[in-house]
């Protein structure tokens, strides 16, 4: 098959969906398929890996940028007559699309809980454009499959856009178990020493480029309220560090919070922790949850995140209702560190077992099956 993947940025230096697209391209090339990428930007060191078809966009405003990419990427995909066109994000006129970004219709309700504010924000050109793009894409008869990363997003796509059940597929993110594995725990002491963290203190790990939306404020409050007063927090990712350091200082836990920035060795940081915590306001499926579990780290997340699909409370982690559920986070932290060392080790083993059932190879195999289904339908039409 000649497959075109559509993604604004083809990169290993950006977010999870960008890295996932690179993995897809490489894996399908290994399977003997011809791969092209339709996008706006590509890392210089990836240029020789694939045929890259650049999309010229109007960047005058965010709304124009998103709309022009969706239209022009779709035009290129149709002109070249690929066997399969697959959008990882928002693009028009493709054979299949994968929901990797937050559904804007739902996100506005989560982000702006006040009804008046929400109504005003819906008139914002950027928000209005994204909602319109989603409506057109998910109701387009030429789009044969809509792929979601979790049960949460599957339900939301049906709720907001009435996508027929037969068009929907849920294909979970996979994890590279050669990179993320429990062996990283052997570096626990060394990593903690590098970061100035005592080898024996209970350590929570948080990883995100969106401190506010992923609940860092609530996490700090929960740590301050916890009866385990020695609990510390490792914050990975870039964001308004000074602002959140001030919040930690005001809560009296400033000396227990460590901002380590963006790390290329994030798997080693997982191995240094005791509990991964990411109570997102809304997220289709944060891959960091799966990465952490593959390294043996139990996960605390919110039921408003697709990542909740892989967490069994008390077995592989803990669930809280929302990003604002400080009391429930406090209770979860207390329960986790009330467990005996043996019980926490058992939980760690269960996490690894869960992640091993979701290797990246499963994702590739299921995606290939999807492409074969779509290609058969196109040939029969």
Please state what every model-predicted region is:
Residues 298-301, 311:
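Short hydrophobic beta-strand element within catalytic cores of glycosyltransferases
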Residues 193, 342-357, 369:
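A short, well-ordered alpha-helix in the C-terminal region of glycosyltransferases
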Residues 125-149, 155:
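Membrane-proximal helix-turn-helix segments that form the acceptor-binding/catalytic region
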Residues 19-23, 202-225, 242:
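A conserved mid-protein helix/loop that constitutes part of the nucleotide-sugar donor-binding site
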Residues 181-197:
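A short helix/loop element that forms part of the nucleotide-sugar donor recognition site in Leloir-type
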Residues 152, 174:
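Carbohydrate-associated surface elements
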Residues 262, 281:
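Aromatic "clamp/platform" in nucleotide-sugar-dependent glycosyltransferases that forms part
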